[in-house]
Amino acid sequence: MKKIGLVLLFSQICLLSYSQFVARAQIKENIEGICDIKNVYALLGMLKDQKEAICSLKDSEIEEKLNKEVQFVKDSTNYDDKGMVSIIINCKGEVVQCKIDNKTKSPILDEQVVNVFKTLTSWKAGKLNGDKVDSIRLWSFEITKGKITFK
């Protein structure tokens, strides 16, 4: 009886090791351009068979663009804050939504940050098991002494 229990336990562990963690985002509003509203994924590039949507600009280039184009931080060199931007990229590599998820203390700053992210239009769609899918990307940012950096 103990041997059967051990065999069952071992087989369950083996099955779990082959399964894959997949996070689906719950989209409550209708977003024009989404390929499949019920299957928008938060992909994790470090997991097998998951590839995040990729922007043509590197994160360091996006940071540089934010610091160059967001007038609020250029005018407020002692300003400290943090926030988060989310972008939904459809299965065709098109940005269908860009918004602030965690707002900063300034609506003006939020608007300027989103406006910069909206200019990022060249994307490769995310992939799950080799198939192009709708996906969401998040960028947490911090502002220290008027300089924006990603966390």
What do the predicted segments below correspond to?
Residues 6, 18-151:
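Charge-biased low-complexity segments
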Residues 4-13:
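Sec-dependent N-terminal signal peptides
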